[in-house]
A protein has these predicted regions:
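Surface-exposed, charged secondary-structure patches
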Residues: 93-141, 243-290
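Hydrophobic pocket/interface hotspot
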Residues: 58, 66, 70-71, 78, ...
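Bacterial N-terminal signal peptides
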Residues: 9-18
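Bacterial N-terminal signal peptides that target proteins for export
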Residues: 1-8
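A mature extracytoplasmic/lumenal domain signature
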Residues: 74, 84-85, 112, 119, ...
Protein backbone atom coordinates (compact mmCIF):
# COMPACT_ATOMS: atom_id res chain seq x y z
CA UNK A 1 0.00 0.00 0.00
CA UNK A 2 1.07 3.54 -0.54
CA UNK A 3 -0.88 6.66 -0.09
CA UNK A 4 -0.61 8.45 -3.38
CA UNK A 5 -4.32 8.73 -3.24
CA UNK A 6 -6.76 9.78 -5.87
CA UNK A 7 -9.92 10.97 -4.12
CA UNK A 8 -12.91 10.56 -6.38
CA UNK A 9 -16.67 10.82 -6.13
CA UNK A 10 -18.59 8.15 -7.94
CA UNK A 11 -20.09 8.98 -11.28
CA UNK A 12 -22.29 6.28 -12.78
CA UNK A 13 -22.34 2.59 -12.15
CA UNK A 14 -20.22 0.37 -14.35
CA UNK A 15 -19.25 -3.26 -14.11
CA UNK A 16 -16.37 -4.00 -12.59
CA UNK A 17 -13.96 -6.28 -13.01
CA UNK A 18 13.18 -22.96 -21.97
CA UNK A 19 15.05 -25.77 -20.56
CA UNK A 20 18.86 -26.22 -20.74
CA UNK A 21 20.75 -29.54 -20.74
CA UNK A 22 22.98 -30.35 -17.74
CA UNK A 23 26.46 -31.87 -18.13
CA UNK A 24 26.37 -35.55 -17.16
CA UNK A 25 29.08 -35.06 -14.56
CA UNK A 26 26.85 -32.70 -12.60
CA UNK A 27 23.81 -34.95 -12.59
CA UNK A 28 24.26 -36.58 -9.15
CA UNK A 29 24.74 -33.26 -7.38
CA UNK A 30 21.90 -31.66 -9.26
CA UNK A 31 19.64 -34.62 -8.58
CA UNK A 32 20.46 -34.36 -4.90
CA UNK A 33 19.68 -30.65 -4.93
CA UNK A 34 16.43 -31.35 -6.72
CA UNK A 35 15.53 -33.94 -4.11
CA UNK A 36 16.29 -31.50 -1.30
CA UNK A 37 14.23 -28.84 -3.03
CA UNK A 38 11.33 -31.21 -3.51
CA UNK A 39 11.48 -32.25 0.13
CA UNK A 40 11.43 -28.66 1.39
CA UNK A 41 7.91 -27.74 2.51
CA UNK A 42 6.24 -24.73 0.93
CA UNK A 43 6.39 -21.55 2.96
CA UNK A 44 3.29 -20.95 5.03
CA UNK A 45 0.68 -18.54 3.76
CA UNK A 46 0.70 -15.14 5.46
CA UNK A 47 -1.85 -14.35 8.12
CA UNK A 48 -4.28 -11.51 7.60
CA UNK A 49 -3.05 -9.98 10.85
CA UNK A 50 0.57 -9.95 9.69
CA UNK A 51 -0.24 -8.29 6.37
CA UNK A 52 -2.60 -5.77 7.98
CA UNK A 53 0.20 -4.83 10.37
CA UNK A 54 2.41 -4.16 7.35
CA UNK A 55 -0.42 -2.28 5.65
CA UNK A 56 -0.95 -0.06 8.69
CA UNK A 57 2.75 0.75 8.76
CA UNK A 58 2.35 1.95 5.18
CA UNK A 59 -0.50 4.25 6.18
CA UNK A 60 1.62 5.59 9.03
CA UNK A 61 4.41 6.26 6.53
CA UNK A 62 1.91 8.14 4.33
CA UNK A 63 0.83 10.19 7.36
CA UNK A 64 4.46 11.02 8.20
CA UNK A 65 5.50 11.49 4.54
CA UNK A 66 8.11 8.76 4.89
CA UNK A 67 8.99 7.54 1.39
CA UNK A 68 11.45 4.98 2.73
CA UNK A 69 8.52 2.66 3.42
CA UNK A 70 7.77 2.54 -0.29
CA UNK A 71 11.43 2.00 -1.16
CA UNK A 72 11.69 -0.93 1.26
CA UNK A 73 8.23 -2.50 1.12
CA UNK A 74 6.91 -1.90 -2.40
CA UNK A 75 7.78 -4.24 -5.24
CA UNK A 76 9.68 -2.64 -8.10
CA UNK A 77 6.89 -3.73 -10.44
CA UNK A 78 4.24 -2.29 -8.15
CA UNK A 79 1.85 0.56 -8.93
CA UNK A 80 -1.28 2.35 -7.79
CA UNK A 81 -4.40 2.95 -9.85
CA UNK A 82 -6.40 6.16 -9.61
CA UNK A 83 -8.73 8.11 -11.83
CA UNK A 84 -5.92 8.78 -14.33
CA UNK A 85 -4.67 5.21 -14.50
CA UNK A 86 -1.40 3.71 -13.25
CA UNK A 87 1.19 5.45 -11.08
CA UNK A 88 4.50 3.63 -10.75
CA UNK A 89 6.80 3.27 -7.75
CA UNK A 90 9.09 6.14 -8.73
CA UNK A 91 6.15 8.55 -8.94
CA UNK A 92 4.89 7.37 -5.56
CA UNK A 93 8.22 8.16 -3.94
CA UNK A 94 8.39 11.55 -5.64
CA UNK A 95 4.94 12.51 -4.38
CA UNK A 96 6.06 12.29 -0.77
CA UNK A 97 8.28 15.33 -1.31
CA UNK A 98 6.20 17.25 -3.87
CA UNK A 99 2.72 16.77 -2.42
CA UNK A 100 1.70 18.66 0.69
CA UNK A 101 -0.56 16.59 2.93
CA UNK A 102 -1.84 17.04 6.45
CA UNK A 103 -3.26 13.83 7.87
CA UNK A 104 -4.87 14.34 11.26
CA UNK A 105 -6.16 10.82 11.70
CA UNK A 106 -7.07 7.58 9.96
CA UNK A 107 -8.45 4.18 10.86
CA UNK A 108 -8.79 0.86 9.04
CA UNK A 109 -11.61 -1.61 9.65
CA UNK A 110 -13.60 -4.53 8.20
CA UNK A 111 -10.42 -6.08 6.79
CA UNK A 112 -10.60 -9.23 4.69
CA UNK A 113 -7.91 -11.33 3.00
CA UNK A 114 -8.28 -13.40 -0.17
CA UNK A 115 -5.45 -15.53 -1.56
CA UNK A 116 -4.88 -15.69 -5.32
CA UNK A 117 -2.55 -18.66 -5.15
CA UNK A 118 0.19 -19.21 -2.55
CA UNK A 119 2.18 -16.08 -3.42
CA UNK A 120 -0.49 -13.39 -3.87
CA UNK A 121 -2.65 -11.93 -1.10
CA UNK A 122 -5.48 -9.44 -1.63
CA UNK A 123 -6.43 -7.24 1.33
CA UNK A 124 -9.68 -5.28 1.34
CA UNK A 125 -10.76 -2.92 4.09
CA UNK A 126 -12.63 0.26 4.90
CA UNK A 127 -10.57 3.38 5.49
CA UNK A 128 -11.74 6.41 7.47
CA UNK A 129 -9.54 9.48 7.32
CA UNK A 130 -9.30 13.14 8.19
CA UNK A 131 -6.82 14.48 5.67
CA UNK A 132 -6.14 17.35 3.29
CA UNK A 133 -3.71 17.05 0.37
CA UNK A 134 -2.73 20.15 -1.60
CA UNK A 135 -5.79 21.95 -0.29
CA UNK A 136 -8.25 19.20 -1.20
CA UNK A 137 -10.22 17.46 1.52
CA UNK A 138 -10.01 13.69 1.40
CA UNK A 139 -13.29 11.77 1.36
CA UNK A 140 -14.06 10.62 4.86
CA UNK A 141 -14.70 6.98 3.95
CA UNK A 142 -13.31 4.75 1.21
CA UNK A 143 -13.11 1.04 0.48
CA UNK A 144 -9.51 0.07 -0.25
CA UNK A 145 -7.75 -2.80 -1.96
CA UNK A 146 -4.09 -3.53 -1.31
CA UNK A 147 -2.28 -6.49 -2.89
CA UNK A 148 0.88 -8.15 -1.61
CA UNK A 149 3.15 -10.65 -3.33
CA UNK A 150 5.87 -12.93 -2.03
CA UNK A 151 9.35 -11.88 -3.17
CA UNK A 152 11.90 -14.27 -1.75
CA UNK A 153 11.19 -14.54 1.96
CA UNK A 154 9.43 -11.18 2.17
CA UNK A 155 5.92 -9.99 1.34
CA UNK A 156 5.83 -6.72 -0.59
CA UNK A 157 3.04 -4.42 -1.67
CA UNK A 158 2.39 -4.41 -5.41
CA UNK A 159 -0.93 -2.57 -5.83
CA UNK A 160 -3.24 -0.09 -4.12
CA UNK A 161 -6.54 1.52 -5.11
CA UNK A 162 -9.56 2.91 -3.32
CA UNK A 163 -13.16 3.79 -4.12
CA UNK A 164 -15.07 6.40 -2.16
CA UNK A 165 -18.10 5.00 -0.36
CA UNK A 166 -21.20 6.77 -1.68
CA UNK A 167 -24.89 6.11 -2.20
CA UNK A 168 -25.31 5.06 -5.86
CA UNK A 169 -28.70 6.73 -6.13
CA UNK A 170 -27.37 9.98 -4.66
CA UNK A 171 -24.16 10.08 -6.71
CA UNK A 172 -23.71 13.14 -8.94
CA UNK A 173 -23.65 12.94 -12.70
CA UNK A 174 -19.89 13.48 -12.89
CA UNK A 175 -16.91 13.02 -10.58
CA UNK A 176 -15.84 15.70 -8.17
CA UNK A 177 -12.23 16.84 -7.87
CA UNK A 178 -9.73 14.04 -7.52
CA UNK A 179 -8.14 13.26 -4.22
CA UNK A 180 -4.48 13.16 -4.63
CA UNK A 181 -3.72 16.54 -5.80
CA UNK A 182 -3.28 18.93 -8.60
CA UNK A 183 0.00 17.13 -9.24
CA UNK A 184 -0.17 15.79 -12.77
CA UNK A 185 1.60 12.48 -12.93
CA UNK A 186 2.97 11.82 -16.37
CA UNK A 187 1.11 9.01 -18.09
CA UNK A 188 3.81 6.56 -19.11
CA UNK A 189 3.16 3.69 -21.51
CA UNK A 190 3.20 0.33 -19.78
CA UNK A 191 5.10 -2.39 -21.60
CA UNK A 192 2.55 -5.15 -22.16
CA UNK A 193 3.21 -8.48 -20.55
CA UNK A 194 3.16 -11.52 -22.82
CA UNK A 195 -0.14 -12.56 -21.29
CA UNK A 196 -1.95 -9.26 -21.86
CA UNK A 197 -3.89 -10.42 -24.94
CA UNK A 198 -5.28 -13.48 -23.18
CA UNK A 199 -6.36 -11.46 -20.17
CA UNK A 200 -7.96 -8.77 -22.32
CA UNK A 201 -9.96 -11.44 -24.14
CA UNK A 202 -11.15 -12.80 -20.80
CA UNK A 203 -12.04 -9.33 -19.55
CA UNK A 204 -13.98 -8.45 -22.70
CA UNK A 205 -15.94 -11.68 -22.44
CA UNK A 206 -16.84 -10.82 -18.86
CA UNK A 207 -18.02 -7.34 -19.79
CA UNK A 208 -20.16 -8.79 -22.59
CA UNK A 209 -21.69 -11.25 -20.14
CA UNK A 210 -22.42 -8.38 -17.73
CA UNK A 211 -24.05 -6.39 -20.55
CA UNK A 212 -26.25 -9.37 -21.39
CA UNK A 213 -27.07 -10.17 -17.74
CA UNK A 214 -25.76 -13.68 -18.50
CA UNK A 215 -25.36 -15.30 -15.09
CA UNK A 216 -24.23 -18.67 -16.47
CA UNK A 217 -21.46 -17.12 -18.58
CA UNK A 218 -20.21 -15.01 -15.68
CA UNK A 219 -20.09 -18.12 -13.51
CA UNK A 220 -17.96 -19.86 -16.16
CA UNK A 221 -15.55 -16.93 -16.52
CA UNK A 222 -14.92 -16.41 -12.82
CA UNK A 223 -13.12 -18.44 -10.17
CA UNK A 224 -14.88 -20.24 -7.35
CA UNK A 225 -13.97 -17.54 -4.83
CA UNK A 226 -14.33 -13.93 -5.95
CA UNK A 227 -14.80 -10.50 -4.40
CA UNK A 228 -15.32 -7.04 -5.83
CA UNK A 229 -15.33 -3.33 -4.96
CA UNK A 230 -17.56 -1.35 -7.29
CA UNK A 231 -17.41 2.27 -8.36
CA UNK A 232 -19.51 3.33 -5.36
CA UNK A 233 -17.18 1.72 -2.83
CA UNK A 234 -19.55 -1.18 -2.21
CA UNK A 235 -17.78 -4.42 -1.33
CA UNK A 236 -19.15 -7.77 -2.46
CA UNK A 237 -17.48 -10.52 -0.45
CA UNK A 238 -18.86 -13.60 -2.20
CA UNK A 239 -19.52 -14.85 -5.69
CA UNK A 240 -23.24 -15.08 -4.98
CA UNK A 241 -23.38 -11.42 -3.92
CA UNK A 242 -21.35 -10.25 -6.92
CA UNK A 243 -23.43 -12.23 -9.41
CA UNK A 244 -26.64 -10.87 -7.94
CA UNK A 245 -25.36 -7.31 -8.32
CA UNK A 246 -23.96 -7.76 -11.84
CA UNK A 247 -27.07 -9.40 -13.24
CA UNK A 248 -29.63 -7.16 -11.53
CA UNK A 249 -31.94 -5.03 -13.72
CA UNK A 250 -30.25 -1.77 -12.68
CA UNK A 251 -28.24 -1.38 -15.89
CA UNK A 252 -29.35 -1.12 -19.52
CA UNK A 253 -26.24 -1.27 -21.71
CA UNK A 254 -25.97 -1.69 -25.49
CA UNK A 255 -22.21 -1.84 -26.06
CA UNK A 256 -19.06 -2.24 -23.95
CA UNK A 257 -15.34 -1.67 -24.53
CA UNK A 258 -12.03 -2.59 -22.88
CA UNK A 259 -9.06 -0.47 -24.00
CA UNK A 260 -5.64 0.80 -22.84
CA UNK A 261 -5.00 -2.52 -21.12
CA UNK A 262 -1.76 -3.64 -19.50
CA UNK A 263 -1.00 -6.81 -17.58
CA UNK A 264 1.60 -7.65 -14.96
CA UNK A 265 2.36 -11.18 -13.80
CA UNK A 266 2.19 -11.46 -10.02
CA UNK A 267 3.14 -15.14 -9.93
CA UNK A 268 3.21 -18.00 -12.45
CA UNK A 269 -0.52 -18.48 -11.91
CA UNK A 270 -1.78 -14.99 -11.05
CA UNK A 271 -1.85 -11.74 -13.02
CA UNK A 272 -3.21 -8.23 -12.66
CA UNK A 273 -4.88 -6.42 -15.57
CA UNK A 274 -5.57 -2.68 -15.66
CA UNK A 275 -7.72 -1.13 -18.36
CA UNK A 276 -10.10 1.61 -19.37
CA UNK A 277 -13.64 0.30 -19.48
CA UNK A 278 -16.60 1.90 -21.20
CA UNK A 279 -20.27 1.18 -21.74
CA UNK A 280 -22.96 2.75 -23.90
CA UNK A 281 -26.00 2.83 -21.65
CA UNK A 282 -27.31 3.71 -18.22
CA UNK A 283 -27.15 2.30 -14.71
CA UNK A 284 -29.63 3.35 -12.06
CA UNK A 285 -30.92 6.02 -14.41
CA UNK A 286 -27.52 7.62 -14.99
CA UNK A 287 -25.32 7.50 -18.05
CA UNK A 288 -22.43 5.13 -17.57
CA UNK A 289 -19.10 6.95 -17.47
CA UNK A 290 -15.64 5.56 -18.30
CA UNK A 291 -13.79 3.72 -15.56
CA UNK A 292 -10.30 2.57 -14.75
CA UNK A 293 -10.65 -1.08 -13.88
CA UNK A 294 -8.29 -3.45 -12.15
CA UNK A 295 -8.87 -7.21 -12.34
CA UNK A 296 -6.96 -10.07 -10.76
CA UNK A 297 -6.93 -13.34 -12.68
CA UNK A 298 -5.78 -16.80 -11.63
CA UNK A 299 -4.84 -19.66 -13.93
CA UNK A 300 -7.09 -22.72 -13.79
CA UNK A 301 -5.80 -25.30 -16.25
CA UNK A 302 -5.46 -23.45 -19.56
CA UNK A 303 -7.95 -20.72 -18.67
CA UNK A 304 -7.59 -17.42 -16.85
CA UNK A 305 -10.41 -16.91 -14.34
CA UNK A 306 -11.40 -13.56 -12.82
CA UNK A 307 -11.13 -13.55 -9.01
CA UNK A 308 -11.07 -9.92 -7.83
CA UNK A 309 -11.64 -6.42 -9.14
CA UNK A 310 -11.96 -2.77 -8.17
CA UNK A 311 -13.23 0.05 -10.39
CA UNK A 312 -12.76 3.81 -10.27
CA UNK A 313 -14.31 6.57 -12.39
CA UNK A 314 -11.82 7.76 -15.02
CA UNK A 315 -10.78 11.38 -14.71
Amino acid sequence: MTKIKYFVLAAAAAFVFTACGTPAGNAPANNANAANTAAKPAAAAPTKEALMTLEKSGWEAWKNRDAKWIEDNYSDKGFNVGSTGRTDKAAMIKSYTTQKCEIKSYSLSDDQMQMAGPDVAILTFKSAQDAVCDGKKAPANVHSASIYIREGDKWKAVFYAEAEIVDPKAAPAKPADKKGSPIKFEAKPVAPDAGTDALVSAEKALWEAWKDHDTKKIEELTARDISFINIFGTYFATKADALKDWTSPGCDVKNVSVTDAAATMLSPTAAILTFNGGADGTCFGQKVGPIWGTSIYIKEGDAWKWTFGINLPAG
